[in-house]
């Protein structure tokens, strides 16, 4: 398989560790069908270099147990724990009209659903254990911020139009709604 640039790679799984003593790997899969991993000629690392070639696999809870070329011992399998597995975007089937891959969101502008204000661009999609979060690079510069990838915070994703519409939740201490704080003579903010 030819190497792909990192931005054209899609994360499809992660080596969770060894399974047994003969070098089989437990792989957590991020595909709808866990056995999809067996359909790819080879899995790569994030930099596009070869990682694993799956020879056989069977479904288990949270993924697959796989036998991979060149991994013949428990120690070799354990050494791969945490390895993220990627495939080129072109190796995946095209999503249906109203579907998309999370990687397709990277780089899309995010606009406020009510005001059409440009909030920023999606830098990455993260998951720290709960729901997915969109990391937003602010339009006006500054530190990136996270937007929950929920129906309430992201009511519309328009892949064909190349835009994500968002209704970010209010920050702690901010008023609800579009009002902005006024400053009094001492420079302190208050809300009317």
From Swiss-Prot:
Kindly list the residue ranges recorded as spanning the membrane: none
The record, for InterPro entries, names: PRC_barrel-like_sf (IPR011033), PRC_RimM (IPR056792), RimM (IPR011961), RimM_N (IPR002676), RimM_N_sf (IPR036976), Transl_B-barrel_sf (IPR009000)
- Any single GO CC term annotated in Swiss-Prot or TrEMBL for this entry: ribosome
Name any one Pfam family assigned in the record. PRC_RimM
Q: Where is the signal peptide?
A: none
Q: What is known of its domains?
A: The PRC barrel domain binds ribosomal protein uS19.
What is this protein identified as?
A: Ribosome maturation factor RimM
Which organism's genome codes for this protein?
Caulobacter sp. (strain K31)
